């Protein structure tokens, strides 16, 4: 499955010149924990999360009215292409230690975002489908297989 198929397409964004106060306010209004930092033509420049604000601003007792998103955002931004597989996206997230990947088109414009939770939900759904498809067949072949709901001692009798 391609990442674009499981992406969120209405992405919460912010520009780098906004204050951290503006950023936190926007996160609150949009009920999100992260924003993709973009320039005027919607090219991603970085990411900023509520965790970044807590650790880099609040914990250091800095003034959120004086700092800009540019001062705190994570750069460079790690992205994915729309046709990449979820396996490739997961590998990239792991390699770079990120939980979200903005998805950009061939021109570098933002077209969506995918998070590790999106990928885990999709993988979980796929695994569930596989189990529902193949587990009954396996039980037909081996009806005496161990099950989790019966203690091993009962299987030995």
Language-model segments: residues:
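Tandem CBS (Bateman) regulatory domains
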Residues: 1-10, 49-79, 85-94, 115-157
